[in-house]
Amino acid sequence: MRVSQSLVPFAIIALVLSFVNAYDPSPLQDFCVAIDDLKGVFVNGRFCKDPKRVDAKDFFFSGLNVPGNTNNQVGSNVTTVNVDQIPGLNTMGISLVRIDYAPHGQNPPHTHPRGSEILVLVEGTLYVGFVSSNQDNNRLFAKVLHPGDVFVFPIGMIHFQVNVGKIPAVAFAGLSSQNAGVITIANTVFGSNPPIYPELLARAFQLDASVVKELQAKFGSI
């Protein structure tokens, strides 16, 4: 599957726009290429590589043209390009992902605790949305996206995407952190290690404890 070349600029715009409100601390030097070396200078959660040893490969990644494998339980695949893939992103306050969706596949409800997200759809049809906080009465903000459409997910809000079309879908998203993190709600609540007390979850979700135990057995094995 090939992404239309005419839509690639939208992905680039999405990433550029994510620069505006980066949540990571601003750097005080040209760059701080991340390195696993305890002798380095510790900046923003990473040690800095000696600037004299930095080269172009520290700012490079190849592979976002390759579709991810969506043959899994949720029917989607996220290819992440953050500070772990590009060490030069350290202190830059940005990262990028490619998301592939099989027909009816989804990126299930999740949050990014350290960054907001701006997503551009380049192929297929997605139903996307986020839910606001308790103080805002948990309102759902959702739209059906078509190629070229853009949607923003505020930092920390539970959000999702699902492919409602008959063909595979592809999206790119920029995040306002070098490592925005991800908390998948179902996996976190029902697949924690060690498990949360079933009785607590049963009351919280108004479910029978046996249902909770079944969910914990399912998600605990993922």
From Swiss-Prot:
Where is it predominantly found?
secreted
Which cysteines share a disulfide bond? Answer: 32-48
Q: Which Gene3D superfamilies match?
A: Jelly Rolls
Q: Which SUPFAM superfamilies match?
A: RmlC-like cupins
Fetch the PROSITE patterns from UniProt.
Answer: GERMIN
GO terms assigned for molecular function:
manganese ion binding
Report keywords, A-Z: Apoplast, Disulfide bond, Glycoprotein, Manganese, Metal-binding, Secreted, Signal
Checking Pfam families in the record gives:
Cupin_1
Q: Name one GO cellular component term.
A: apoplast
- Domain Cupin type-1: start-end pairs: 62-213
Which compartments is it annotated to reside in?
Answer: Secreted, Extracellular space, Apoplast
Q: Which PANTHER family match?
A: GERMIN-LIKE PROTEIN SUBFAMILY 3 MEMBER 3
Q: What is the annotated role of this protein in its UniProt record?
A: May play a role in plant defense. Probably has no oxalate oxidase activity even if the active site is conserved.
Subunit annotation? Oligomer (believed to be a pentamer but probably hexamer).
The record's family statement is:
Belongs to the germin family.
Per its record, how is this protein called by name?
Germin-like protein subfamily 1 member 20
